[in-house]
C-alpha cells in the first residue's frame, strides 16, 4: 500500500514540478511578481541596442561583458526579417546563439519580438512583406501619405506576423523548456502612430466613423472605477455615452484619435498573445510608444 501511495504521489508531483519550471506572474496584493523556478526573481537587466543581436559575432562579443557588469538578465531583440527571410522559411540561428550565450554566461533572457512594428515603424518586417503592400497594407496620414507602418486593421498583416511569432515560440519551447533561460517575451516594440495620431486609410476611416465596439464600451462600464483618470475624464466629457461613434463617445480631438488607435493595436497583440500562450505559456508583455 505504501509503495502504491508513493507511486500515485510521484505521478502527481512530476507534472507539478514541470509546471513550476516555467516562469510565471503572481499577484501580490496590488503588485505583480515575477517567479522563476518557483521563486521571486528580481530582474537586474540590460537591454541590447536595436541591431546588436543581428549577428553571431556580435552576440558572442557582447554577452561576456554583460556578465561582468553584474547583470542577471539581458533584453534581446529578435528580428522578424532575420527569422523569416523567405516567406514560410524560418531561421532560428540567432535565437539559438542568444540562448547558448546566455547559459554560458549565467544570464536569463527577455526577448523583444520586433515584428510588424518597432518604434511604430515596420522596419524589421521581412522584405517579402514590405514589397507586397497590396496584401499587407500601410497606414496613411490625413494628407494621404503612405507610411512605412503596417496597418493594424489588416487581417493579413496580423496573420503573417502571428505565424512567424508562433513558429518562433514553438522553437523556443523545444530548445528551452527544460532549462528555462527565456523568462519573458515582449510582443512588438513601442507600437503606435507617427506623423498623425491615427491611421487615415479607407479601412481606418470606415471604422472611425462607425459605432464604438460594444466590447470596448462594456469594458469601460465594468472597469469604470479603475479607469485611468484621463480616460475617465474623456468619457465623462461626453456624458458617459454607451453608444455612438468614437467622436460622439469621446469628443472630437487628437486624444480620441489615440483612443481609437489603441483599440486595434490592443486586439492585435492580444490575439498574438493568446496563440503564443497556447504554445508556450511564459509571461508576455507589451510596451507602448
Segments (PLM) and residue ranges:
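Positively charged n-region of N-terminal signal peptides that target proteins for export
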Residues: 1-4
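Hydrophobic h-region of N-terminal signal peptides that target proteins for export
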Residues: 9-18
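N-terminal carbohydrate-binding accessory modules
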Residues: 18-71
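Solvent-exposed loop/turn segments at secondary-structure junctions
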Residues: 41, 49-53, 79-83, 115-119, ...
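Short, well-ordered coil/turn segments that N-cap beta-strands
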Residues: 42-44, 70-72, 103-109, 174, ...
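Aromatic-lined substrate-binding rim segments of carbohydrate-active enzymes
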Residues: 58-133, 269-279
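Polysaccharide-binding and catalytic clefts of secreted carbohydrate-active enzymes
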Residues: 125, 132-289
